[in-house]
Amino acid sequence: MEFSGSPLTLFCCVFFLFLTGSLAQGIGSIVTNDLFNEMLKNRNDGRCPANGFYTYDAFIAAANSFPGFGTSGDDTARRKEIAAFFGQTSHETTGGSLSAEPFTGGYCFVRQNDQSDRYYGRGPIQLTNQNNYEKAGNAIRQDLVNNPDLVATDATISFKTAIWFWMTPQDNKPSSHDVIIGSWTPSAADQSANRAPGCGVITNIINGGIECGVGPNAAVEDRIGYYRRYCGMLNVAPGDNLDCYNQRNFAQG
């Protein structure tokens, strides 16, 4: 290709091509605006308290703050992680049956209904507990201990706390990220607890104390339903070990 512009113009053009090429390989190359809106199609329903809060731009800005999120491994691993993240967070924020189509009520809520504790659940992952607010705030450089409501009033911060929780191992729990991309190897304790790689372990990480090891229950079924829907939209197989019915929760060792 012949180029007749100045060296500065040439540099700018090359930089632009490099930048747009890099962005094309990011999470936005899989989660487009249209796909985001179709996945979370009822989030702006007038019956939803979160109406107008969760935006595509806020999600992309937050995701880009965590370079490995939705960009690790091959295309299948990336798509599966996105499906798992939105499957879990859609359950956490579900508004139930907003339409005849099942598993389309995600991202209806920002705040937990029970707000008796200052650090009640907020955002896509329903971040709770002062310790989590402090750790998340340190990671994203926000004072969430003194300003916890930032998680419910700033959509980018809200998504950042959810992705931080997703990407970060805690105590004896692996990160949800490592589980879904296949980087986690169960320890002897995990094997004894029936914790095998798959979305069931992610449910155990997020809410195992209530939902895991107690047999079949509606909450786990809802998480699986959302995950399967998003896997279908992303053209990826959901894999094995989707529930945690027979898993010991992490608090039990």
UniProtKB/Swiss-Prot annotation:
Reactions accelerated catalytically: Random endo-hydrolysis of N-acetyl-beta-D-glucosaminide (1->4)-beta-linkages in chitin and chitodextrins
InterPro entries documented for this protein: Glyco_hydro_19, Glyco_hydro_19_cat, Lysozyme-like_dom_sf
UniProt-listed Enzyme Commission number(s): 3.2.1.14
Subcellular locations according to the entry: Secreted
Any single GO CC term annotated in Swiss-Prot or TrEMBL for this entry: extracellular region
GO molecular function, a single term: endochitinase activity
Disulfide bridge map: 212-244
Superkingdom, natural source: Eukaryota
Keyword Secreted found: yes
Gene Ontology annotations of biological process type: cell wall macromolecule catabolic process; chitin catabolic process; defense response to fungus; polysaccharide catabolic process
Keywords: Carbohydrate metabolism, Chitin degradation, Disulfide bond, Glycosidase, Hydrolase, Pathogenesis-related protein, Plant defense, Polysaccharide degradation, Secreted, Signal
Location (main, coarse): secreted
Induction (free text): By TMV infection.
First-level EC class: hydrolase
CDD domains linked to this entry: chitinase_GH19
Signal peptide annotation: 1-24
SUPFAM superfamilies: Lysozyme-like
Residue numbers annotated as active site: 92 (proton donor)
Sequence similarity: Belongs to the glycosyl hydrolase 19 family. Chitinase class I subfamily.
Cited function: Defense against chitin-containing fungal pathogens.
Protein name: Acidic endochitinase P
Species per Swiss-Prot/TrEMBL record: Nicotiana tabacum (Common tobacco)
